[in-house]
Amino acid sequence: MNPVIKKFQFGQSTVTLETGRIARQASGAVLVTVDDDVTVLVTVVGAKTADPSKGFFPLSVHYQEKTYAAGKIPGGFFKREGRPSEKETLTSRLIDRPIRPLFPEGFMNEVQVVCTVVSTSKKTDPDIAAMIGTSAALAISGIPFDGPIGAARVAFHESTGYLLNPTYEQQKASSLDMVVAGTSEAVLMVESEAKELTEDQMLGAVLFAHDEFQVVINAVKELAAEAAKPTWTWAPQPEATALLGAIRSEFGAAISDAYTITVKADRYARLGELKDQVVAKLSGEEGQPSSSEVKAAFGEIEYRTVRENIVNGKPRIDGRDTRTVRPLNIEVGVLPKTHGSALFTRGETQALVVATLGTARDAQLLDTLEGEKKDPFMLHYNFPPFSVGECGRMGGAGRREIGHGRLARRSISAMLPAADVFPYTIRVVSEITESNGSSSMASVCGASLALMDAGVPMKAPVAGIAMGLVKEGQKFAILTDILGDEDHLGDMDFKVAGTAKGVTALQMDIKIKGITEEIMEIALGQALEARLNILGQMNQIIGQSRTELSENAPTMIAMKIDTDKIRDVIGKGGATIRAICEETKASIDIEDDGSIKIFGETKEAAEAARQRVLGITAEAEIGKIYVGKVERIVDFGAFVNILPGKDGLVHISMLSDARVEKVTDILKEGQEVEVLVLDVDNRGRIKLSIKDVAAAKASGV
C-alpha cells in the first residue's frame, strides 16, 4: 500500500501520523512524529485464532526507549538495551489501561502492542506520542476494538491555569502532572501527581484534557478511513441463558447468602463449595456443558448478584454501607532497629512500611534518554503471595508492584522536604502482609506514618483511599474503601491520595462508558470525606514528624568551604578524603560550589570528620596561639606544622629571648610546641614565634 499521512495541530505541537511505509507485516503500524522532538513507531499484531486454554484476554503492551533515539550508546559491558526500565514498565501500563476495556468481552485472541521510541530531542516525554500511536495502529489493524482513544498530559499553574502537553522545562514549574486518556464520549484512565490541588482543580484538569484530545480522535478516524484493513469477522459466544437460569434458580439464594459472610477466607471457602456443587450437578454427563463453561457461568452469577445487591441499596459484602471506611489499626515504631516503621491495617488489608535514611551516595542513579539523574527518594512496594493466602512466585518486582509503588511515591513526594533542608536519601519499602483491596493506598498511609516516625520533616501527613463504582442502567452506587471483590466486580477503580488541604495523587481506571462529570464529582467528594477520616485517626497516633531522627539513622552535618580549598580536602588522587573517611568511618560528599555533606553512622563519627575538614580548610589567624609539631629544622630556624597542610617558620631569633647558637639546642624534630602567628604574607607564608607566646598569653590571647 502507498503511505498514508495525516497531520494535525495538538496544542502547541504538530503531530504527524504515517502508515504504510514501515513495519508493513504487522496488523497495524503507525509512525508518530511530534514536531521534530519525538518519533515513536507503534505496531500492533493480533493472533488470528484464540487460545481457549487461557482464561483471560492475552493483551501485552511493550513500550521501549532505544538509546540511539537520543544519540547515546548504552552503558554496561554488553552495550545493548537490557531489561525494561521502571519508566518503560510504567508507560507500558499507562498505555494498556485505557485500551484493555475497549476490546469486546469474550475476545481471547492474543494482541501485542510494541511502542518503540526511535528519535527524541529530550524536550518532551514520548509517552503521549506512544498512546496516540497505539490508538491509530489499533484503529487501522482490523482487530475488533471500540476506539479510537485520545490522550493528553496536563500541567497547572495558579497564574496561567491548565497547560496542554508541557515540555520537561514547563513541567518543572507546574503543580500538576496528569495524563488522561479516553474515547470521544468518556474518560477511561487518569494518572496524576499534584501539589495539594483541590478536588475541583483536579476534575477541571480531567475535563480539560478530554476536550483537548478530541482532535486526536478525529485525526485517527480520518487515518482509519483511508488506511484501515477490513474488520475481522468475530462474534462473541452466545450467552448460556439456560445454564445461567439453572444456576440462579437452584443456587442463586445460596450464592447471595455466601456474599453476606464478612470474613474473606470463610466467604471464599463457602463459594468454593457452592461452585463444586454446581459443577458436579450441571456438567460431566453427555450433552451437558463442560466444567469450564459451568465455572464461567457461576462467575457470571456471582458478578450479577453482588452488583444487584449494591445498586439496590443492600449492605456490601462485609456489611458496610457505601460511605464507611473499614476499621483501622495503626502502630508506629514497630521495628526497633529500623529508622522509621509503621504497621497500617484497614480491615483485611495490612501494610508493614519501613523508612530508611541514607547518604547522597545512596540515591538511585537513573540512566534515561534525557541523561543521567539521581533520585533521592525511592518507594518500593512488595506483594508476596502469602498476603492473599496463596502459594506463588517469589522474585523480582512485577509490573503491578512497580505500578503500585509509583502511585504511592507520587502520593508522598510533594510532601517531602526540599533537599537543601533535608539532604538525606530516603527509601520507603511497603511490605503487603495482608490484602483485601486497596493495598496501594494502605502503602500511602503507612509510608506517611513511617516517614514521620523516622523524623523526616514532612510538610503534612498523607492518606489515600480507593473508591469504586457499580452502575446498572441509570442506577449507580459509589463505594468508599473497596474490597478486592468489589474492585474486580465493579466498573471503576478510583484512587485518591492527599493531605487535609488537597490532592497529591489521583489514579482512575474505568471499565465502562457513561461515567459522567457528576459521578466523578461525587466520587471525589466522597473520597475527601474518607481521607479526612483516615487522617484524623492517623494524627491520633502521630500527628507530625518526630523532632529528632532515629538513633539508628546516620548523622548528617552540612558545611561550606571556599572552592579553592576543595583540592586540599580531596588531596592528591583522593588520598586525603579517603583517609578521613577510613579513619572516622564517615562518608563525605563535596559539591563544586564547596558545599560539603558529612554522613556518619554515629554523631561522634560525623563530628570527627567535620573537625578534620575544618583543620584542612582553616586559615592561620594572626595573633592566635597554636600547638604545632616541629616538622623540619634548618640553620636559620624551624618549620612547625600548625594546621593540616600548613607549616610556618620560627626564625632562630624568635626561639628565645636569650641568644641561640643552634636551633637544635632548643628544638628537635617531632617535638610539640606552642607558637604565636606573627604574620601571613601575600604568598601565604606564615611567620611564627615561640618567645612571644608567654607575653601573648599574659595579654589574654
Swiss-Prot record:
It comes from the Bacteria. Its cofactor is Mg(2+). It is found in: Cytoplasm. Keywords: Cytoplasm, Magnesium, Metal-binding, Nucleotidyltransferase, RNA-binding, Transferase. It catalyses: RNA(n+1) + phosphate = RNA(n) + a ribonucleoside 5'-diphosphate. The keyword Cytoplasm applies. InterPro entries: ExoRNase_PH_dom1, ExoRNase_PH_dom2, ExoRNase_PH_dom2_sf, KH_dom, KH_dom_type_1, KH_dom_type_1_sf, NA-bd_OB-fold, PNPase. GO terms for molecular function: 3'-5'-RNA exonuclease activity; magnesium ion binding; polyribonucleotide nucleotidyltransferase activity; RNA binding. Involved in mRNA degradation. Catalyzes the phosphorolysis of single-stranded polyribonucleotides processively in the 3'- to 5'-direction. This is Polyribonucleotide nucleotidyltransferase. It comes from Pseudomonas fluorescens (strain SBW25).
